[in-house]
Amino acid sequence: KQWTWGNGDFGQAWDRNLTDTDGPYIELMTGVYTDNQPDFTWLQPYEEKIFTQYFIPYRELGVVKNATSDLLMNIETEDTKNAILKLFATSAQKGLRIVIKRQEDIIWENITDLTPKAVFTHTIKNISPDEAEVYIYCSTGKLLLSWKAESTEIKPIPEPAKPALPPSEVRSTEQLYLTGLHLEQYRHATYNPTDYYLEALRRDNSDIRNNNAMGLWLFRKGQFKKAELYLRKAINTLTERNPNPYDGEPYYNLGLVLKYQDKTVEAYDAFYKACWKAAWQDSGYYSLAQLSAAHNEWDNALYEINQSLVRNWHNHRGRHLKAMILRKLGREKEAIELIKESLNIDKFNFGCRFEAWLQSGEKEMPSSLRVLMRDESRNYEELATDYAQAGNWEDALAVVNAALTNISAPSTMLLYYKAWFLCRMNQQDEAVCVVSQAENSPLDEYFPNSLEAILALQCVTNLPIHAPKAFYLLGNIWYDKRQYQEAVDAWEHSKEMDNGFPTVLRNLSLAYFNKLGKKKEAVQLLEQAFMLDETDARILMELDQLYKRMDYSPKERLHLLNKHKEIIATRDDLYLEYATLLNLTGEYEQAMQLIDQRQFHPWEGGEGKVPAQYQYARIQLAKKSLKAGEYEHALALIEECFVYPHHLGEGKLYGAQENDFLYYKGCILEAMGNHDEAHSSFTKAASGNGQPTAAMYYNDQKPDKIYYQGLALRKVGKEAEARGRFNSLISYGEKHLYDTFVM
């Protein structure tokens, strides 16, 4: 689909923000296996979905009714009686047969050649596009393209999406499972899928699907031991009546959590059991091959990876694993043939390319592989952990060493991976040296998020060495995985080792406030973090927001910000907060000057905030001028509220509510003696929706707009309607005063 912000003031502001030439902006959105933009889908382990999308330039057609990669077609009304057919070919098309039907009757037929040089047009007499059916055949008679108008019958409007019920109100364990699954799929920001799974298990702790879902969720969060308990419960129920159950997924998931705990014998059994079911054979046998390779059982590993590839020929990691196994078996020729075949399927198979390099015996990594991997640390980490998953620590180490050689600024995490690999190779002293190197490296802006990173960091934090950075990164992963207590524990260890690490103090502050309810401690930590680095504008912004949450007065907050004006100027959000505080403390002139001298850039969550402060300062100054009898100045200030200058970074939305501006404009005009104009302004100010609603988004009507409607109605003599507006606000407030807001 195509998305545009429109051509109004709001849309033109986005044109300026999003295009180099400040011209029109159209956003193309495309998708496959999906009905709409947020319709996320599932991928099974090592699954590949294949699709082709064509982006085709065309001209002169108007609105395309149907298209293929070869032809584009439009049919539209030429006048009240006739229709015009337009065709555009992307390549030469000879002997096309074009048929126009009305119901079953052919009313026009033609055979023609098309080329991209000219658009084919033909007028069909005495028919409307709604009546016409278009069929286009190639010279051999194959139907290339067809179209007919959709039925004009009124279809029922689909029901809008409904919010999930609280877990306790969901009737069945099945619906609890489906709701949790939906929340996982759409990654809902405020609802927690585990609340639904756990409620289902509270009602029936043997439920297969909810136990499996909880186990899989915990596995993805790095909680392998906890996940194992749920998965074993699922399997116990699954095998009560049949030792070879219908579904193999819980066995496969159990194999994963056991493997990540180094319980390789039990993991092997679980994966083999999963392979009883066809749906899990490709991923199950692949995992078995990894385990066999880790134990140097190369013949078994080859058999298992072959079984996996039979079920999933395009498992590119499986192909890499097979190439490695063949190399270990000394079957280099077969390995090279497999690598060539694999690269014909996917030229970006880093694993196969790395295997080719290992087999070549060359000292330096080929430049072609470096170019494809872009000297990107993350690519090397992924490749190294592929080897690690197969217990091939030597080659995993070789990948990391290649990265450290080739990348000018490798991620610190590469060093921690190297230390992990060395530990697994029983080279602890060397691992300690590498961790020391990592701890003394600059902290990069890189945040690991993989399960292997958890294992690596857990390993290095157990070494006999001072490792505050490793604990810091481990805390980051745990927080990302929503394992908040583990995150706090890791950060507290980091803090104990290095109390001068501002980012750790900042992270702990957020966790204390948001997750543990330790508000005073959160303030102390964030203040300490900022004292350690008073150049960090983000921490200053967050400290001010924390003061705001703790109900510090605007003057107290200004006292902090006034000390750091240079830093404030580096962030739009902090700069705007400073201007807002000036407005709140009556420094309207200064606030207006600050806003007027800056070019703002929109940010998500900040929509509407800059114009709001721009307008608020002017309204307050206009009120002062009105009171002082400076009517012309007051009117000029109010008129500026109706226009969004470009430096605000935003445009005015169509239908923006301006009741307050119109009301004050009327008051000024009234004071100037322009009663007719004043009455007109009051009348406009009195219009709009008079029913209060929750103002959640920046373009929702704010309740004060209704208040100004009431004031304006009073000005035009409609006292009863004015009181109605005021009473509606009071009633809404009383009704919702004690509501618990859930988003």
For the regions a language model picked out, list residue spans one by one.
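Start-of-helix register in tetratricopeptide repeats
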Residues: E174-Q175, R209, E249, S283, ...
